[in-house]
Amino acid sequence: MAYILKATKCPTDELSLTNRAIVNVGDFPEEIKYADISPAPGQHFIFALEKTVEVPSGYVGFSLVQRKWAMVSINQELEVRPYRFDASSDVITCVSFETDFLQKKTVSQEPYDSDQMAKEFIMQFAGMALTVGQSLVFNFKDKKLLGLAVKSLEAIDPKSLGEGKDTAMRNVRFGRILGNTVVQFEKAENSSLNLQGKSKGKVVRQSIINPDWDFGKMGIGGLDKEFNSIFRRAFASRVFPPELVEQLGCKHVKGILLYGPPGTGKTLMARQIGTMLNAREPKIVNGPQILDKYVGESEANVRRLFAEAEEEEKRLGPNSGLHIIIFDEIDAICKQRGSVAGNSGVHDTVVNQLLTKIDGVDQLNNILVIGMTNRRDMIDEALLRPGRLEVQMEISLPNEQGRVQILNIHTKRMREFNKINDDVDNKEIAALTKNFSGAELEGLVRAAQSSAMNRLIKADAKVTVDPEAMEKLKVNRDDFLHSLEHDIKPAFGTAQEILDNMLARGVINWGAPVSNLLEDGMLYVQQAKAPESSGLVSVLVAGAPNSGKTALAAQLAKMSDFPFVKVCSPEDMVGYTESAKCLHIRKIFDDAYRSMLSCIVVDNVERLLDYGSIGPRYSNMTLQALLVLLKKQPPKGRKLLILCTSSRREVLEEMEMLTAFTSVLHVPNLSKPDHVLAVLENTDIFSKGEIQAIGKKMAGKRVFIGIKKLLGLIDMARQTEQSQRAIKFLSKMEEEGGLDMVARQ
């Protein structure tokens, strides 16, 4: 038998807390305790009934929570049918509720004992009808009202009872609870409710890691190892429930420092960490933006960054969401305290304020500070200790596999729209772009695109574009090779122009001494490359002035085929103070440590040390800096070859500098007529007859001249008339002391 009743509000708050449908005493017989209420065809909701005289006949009262769940409006006509539960199959053995405060604005950190809550719930609602998804209001010990949502219902499977098997449980859509029903409370997602006790179920938490992220979509390549390391150190603890973390006594990592050469992807990586995480949009702050001209405003700017996190931590406690704050160029505001001149001390107080916010007396556990810098050495040490920016990750230059990934990312759209030729092999380009950073690889792709576009532009009186450019435009292999040769050079690459300048005349093999020097030099190169080597090989190329030491060192550096070759020359430091010179030398070595294979050519060491024989005088500060750097081992896995040249070996020995070198290569002068003749044959200035005549004149004479001096005399002879060249050459050699025309005794 169906009744047609109109919906109305629940007459009193006390009746609302019963979570039952309120009907008039005269509308239903005493034995009917449950009703199937249907607000629309196909919709059925099972309610327990509460009979009272406070509801008019022909009406059924619902609380606001019940009306929302059953989608019932005031004065809506409802079809109400009496309902009877099956005593054997509809008895709920276990119910699980998703629990939160009914009114989210009035939250409390007061603990709620889930065991006591379960007992109280059974006392209040024994015999109650429940449906999965049903919303209820629960008043526990006059504390703040709780909102419950039925998450799951379990009942005994009657088949297992009939077959004599072990009792089996099955999930049901609705049922009624009895005095022995097990009640569990699970905290709702992002709820600040503090549940305690054994009747506490699983906590509903949103995974901190976004499920659909990947490096390719984020535009990041070659940083898989770094991301894995950051995840292990910084995010693994945040994946687990706060209760487990609390039981372990574990503290989350609050800070990450990303450092490394410019253009390697530090800022991109930090920006995309927010995409990787299910957290609030990160606050990205440029370091200098923090500083303010007004007293105290710089510190206030730091406090404002943490204000939201502090407020949420107080309100939600361990259930607070993660707040990410990213500092770009953090070295601008976190320099070593006491290192900045001036009496304002603004930088020092900003550092102090940041230290206290990250890990001070009132600790915040819901923040992650990410700092980025090229100059890790400038940052205050207190900021780098555990509890602050404790995860320090070097974002180094990508290896060949990483360069392939980066090139794939930057050429992806061209491949999608068929704007790149099949002859472009990213693996080949990656092999050619040693020590290129991510930004430089992106620049290389742009330069190749510009080269391809330029082919379709006609620059006559007017600049016109080929009308069929859309179809013709394709980037090919030659575009990449052209850009690699002319447009983009790596900051941590080979100083090719300087080496070519040093080798303007090449290395002339005038005899066995030169061959032996090149062979020995290549042995040191192989020693530096060898996996089992210590990682540091330093060689002094010593010899008389003008003997070709610089050219030999440059030739060895070029033959090494190291991706990073830098020249440290006194020419680049003219006018530098001692401290500026030391900083310049140190920067060259620091840059070398960032490459897997590096070679540094330190030319003319005694000039670098400001050595003067009258006095004598030298720069002790520069000497000590060089001694330290020559002996310093590069980081693990990095290899460094140092080639130094000097014309004053005895001076370096007095300065106790020779012991800093692995070995010494002695470059001799030309000491035999055959040596000079070999050079003359190589220069193609003198005819064979002239060379033979010069050989006869020099036979039995003492020869001692440097290759550089000899080449200078040959250039001078080039300007002389053909008939006088040989005579002029020999006379100048004698004048310069390179040839003693007196016969040997």
Swiss-Prot record:
The keyword Hydrolase applies. Binds 1 Mg(2+) ion per subunit. Its cofactor is Mg(2+). SUPFAM superfamilies: ADC-like (SSF50692), Cdc48 domain 2-like (SSF54585), P-loop containing nucleoside triphosphate hydrolases (SSF52540). One of its GO terms (biological process) is autophagy. It holds the Pfam family AAA_lid_3. Its main location: cytoplasm. Keywords: ATP-binding, Cytoplasm, ER-Golgi transport, Hydrolase, Magnesium, Metal-binding, Nucleotide-binding, Protein transport, Repeat, Transport. SMART domains: AAA, CDC48_2, CDC48_N. ATP binds at R505, G506, V507, I508, N509, W510, P545, N546, S547, G548, K549, T550, A551, L552. GO terms for cellular component: cytoplasm; Golgi stack; neuromuscular junction; neuromuscular junction of somatic muscle; presynaptic cytosol; terminal bouton. Its EC number is 3.6.4.6. Signal peptide: none annotated. PROSITE patterns: AAA. It comes from the Eukaryota. It is found in: Cytoplasm. It catalyses: ATP + H2O = ADP + phosphate + H(+). One of its GO terms (molecular function) is ATP binding. Required for vesicle-mediated transport. Catalyzes the fusion of transport vesicles within the Golgi cisternae. Is also required for transport from the endoplasmic reticulum to the Golgi stack. Seems to function as a fusion protein required for the delivery of cargo proteins to all compartments of the Golgi stack independent of vesicle origin. Homohexamer. Belongs to the AAA ATPase family. This is Vesicle-fusing ATPase 1. The lineage of its organism: Eukaryota, Metazoa, Ecdysozoa, Arthropoda, Hexapoda.
